C-alpha cells in the first residue's frame, strides 16, 4: 500500500510541475485505445472486452487501437520494473490521437491515475480498479468496479447442489488477493446451500500455462476429491476444462466472463457472465453520440444493473434448482441477502444464518 501511495504521489507532483502543451483532440472520428494484460482471445475476460470494442467499431466507425502488455521481463530491457514496462506500453498506445483509453484489469489501477494527470486531453476508463481509498479519481478518468461476489454466490450455491463430493475447488492465478470478492461470495453460496461442504483453494504460479492448469485440476479432482472447480486463472484456467473432459462427465467446472459451456458441454454446469464489453460499449457510445464523459467517479455494477448474471440452463440444472437460483437472485437484488466480499463479511454472514 505504501509503495502504491508513493507511486501515485510522485505522479501528482510531476504533473503539478508540468504544464501540458497538448490540445484537446478535435476530430470527427473518435479514436479508442485498449490496453490489456494477455490475449484478447482468451475465451473469457479479455474476449468480452474485445467483443465489446469491436461492436463499437462496427456500429460507430471509430478507429480502434488494441494492445496487450509485452511479456515481462522484456527482452533487451530487463532492468525495467513491471510498472515502467506497463507505462511504456501505455505510452505506445498514446502515440495515437486518442479520445478514449480503456485500461483492462486491476493491475492498471495506479497507472490510470498517473496517465490521467499527465494527459488531461484523453478520457480514461479503468476496469476492475482497486479501491483508491482517499485518492480522488481524476476528472478525466472513470473507475469501474463489479459486485463479483453476487454472481459468485449463485455459482457457489449451484456447485454445492450439483457436486457429488464433499469438497468444492477454487483455482486462481498468482495475484489472488484482488479476487477475494469472488472467493468469499462463492464460499458463502456453498455454505448457504450446504454448511458441511468445504472449499479447497489453490493458486497457480502463472496465468498463461494451460498445461499447469490441467495438471493442478487433475490433482484437485483425483487427490483432493473436489466435485466442482471454479477457475479464475486466465489461460491457465482453460486447463481445468481439459482435465474435466479427460476425466468424464461427472467432473464439473464453472465458467467465467462468458457462457463457457461450449468448451466442455458435459462438464460446465454454469457460467458467471461478466459483460465487461457491455459496460465499455455503453460508456463509449454515450461519449461518441454526445461528446459527454462523466469522469471523476467510481461506477459499481452487479446483478441489478444486468451486467453480471449466472447461466441457468434447465437442461443441466433441474427445474427446481433453476427456480431456487432465480429466487436467490431476486433476494440479492432486493437487498434481502447481502453477499459477503471479504473474510470479515463472510464470518458475519455465517453468524446470521
From Swiss-Prot:
**Is Transcription found in the keyword set?**
no
Where does the record place the S-diacylglycerol cysteine lipid attachment?
Answer: 17
Q: N-palmitoyl cysteine lipidation: where?
A: 17
Q: Show the SUPFAM superfamilies listed in the entry.
A: Periplasmic binding protein-like I
Localization, UniProt: Cell inner membrane
- Annotated InterPro entries: BMP_lipoprotein, Peripla_BP_I, PnrA-like
* Topology of the protein relative to the lipid bilayer: Lipid-anchor
Q: Name one GO cellular component term.
A: plasma membrane
Q: Which residues form the signal peptide?
A: 1-16
Highest taxon of source: Bacteria
Subunit structure and binding partners = Monomer.
Q: Which protein family is it in?
A: Belongs to the BMP lipoprotein family.
UniProt-listed PANTHER family: ABC TRANSPORTER GUANOSINE-BINDING PROTEIN NUPN, TRANSCRIPTIONAL ACTIVATOR PROTEIN MED
* Stated role: May be part of an ABC-type nucleoside uptake system involved in the purine salvage pathway.
Protein name, UniProt field: Basic membrane protein C
Amino acid at each position: 500500500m505504501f509503495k502504491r501511495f508513493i507511486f501515485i504521489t510522485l505522479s501528482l507532483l510531476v504533473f503539478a510541475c508540468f504544464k501540458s502543451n497538448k490540445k484537446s483532440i478535435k476530430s470527427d472520428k473518435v479514436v479508442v485505445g485498449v490496453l490489456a494484460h494477455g490475449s484478447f482471445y482468451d475465451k473469457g475476460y479479455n474476449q468480452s472486452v474485445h467483443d465489446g470494442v469491436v461492436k463499437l467499431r462496427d456500429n460507430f466507425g471509430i478507429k480502434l487501437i488494441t494492445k496487450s502488455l509485452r511479456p515481462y521481463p522484456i527482452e533487451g530491457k530487463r532492468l525495467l520494473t513491471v510498472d515502467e514496462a506497463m507505462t511504456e506500453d501505455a505510452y505506445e498506445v498514446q502515440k495515437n490521437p486518442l479520445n478514449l483509453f480503456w485500461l483492462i484489469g486491476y493491475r492498471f489501477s495506479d497507472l490510470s491515475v498517473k496517465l490521467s494527470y499527465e494527459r488531461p486531453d484523453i478520457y480514461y476508463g479503468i476496469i476492475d480498479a482497486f479501491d483508491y481509498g482517499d485518492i480522488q479519481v481524476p476528472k478525466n478518468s472513470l473507475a469501474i468496479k463489479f459486485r463479483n461476489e453476487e454472481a459468485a454466490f449463485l455459482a457457489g450455491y449451484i456447485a454445492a447442489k450439483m457436486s457429488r463430493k464433499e469438497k468444492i475447488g477454487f483455482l486462481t492465478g498468482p495475484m489472488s488477493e484482488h479476487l477475494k470478492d469472488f472467493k468469499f461470495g462463492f464460499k458463502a453460496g456453498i455454505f448457504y446451500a450446504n454448511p458441511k461442504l468445504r472449499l479447497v483453494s489453490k493458486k497457480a504460479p502463472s496465468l498463461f500455462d494451460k498445461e499447469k492448469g490441467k495438471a493442478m485440476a487433475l490433482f484437485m479432482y483425483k487427490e483432493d476429491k473436489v466435485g466442482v472447480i471454479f477457475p479464475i486463472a486466465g489461460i491457465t484456467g482453460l486447463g481445468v476444462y481439459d482435465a474435466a473432459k479427460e476425466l468424464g462427465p461427472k467432473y464439473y467446472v464453472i465458467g467465467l466472463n462468458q457462457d463457457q459451456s461450449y468448451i466442455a458441454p458435459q462438464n460446465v454446469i454454469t457460467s458467471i457472465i461478466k459483460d465487461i464489453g457491455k459496460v465499455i460499449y455503453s460508456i463509449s457510445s454515450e461519449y461518441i453520440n454526445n461528446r459527454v464523459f462523466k469522469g471523476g467517479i467510481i461506477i459499481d455494477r452487479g446483478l441489478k444493473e444486468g451486467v453480471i448474471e449466472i447461466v441457468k440452463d434447465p437442461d443441466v440444472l433441474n427445474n427446481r434448482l433453476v427456480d431456487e437460483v432465480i429466487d436467490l437472485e431476486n433476494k440479492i437484488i432486493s437487498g434481502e441477502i447481502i453477499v459477503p466480499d471479504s473474510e470479515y463479511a463472510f464470518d458475519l454472514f455465517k453468524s446470521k444464518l
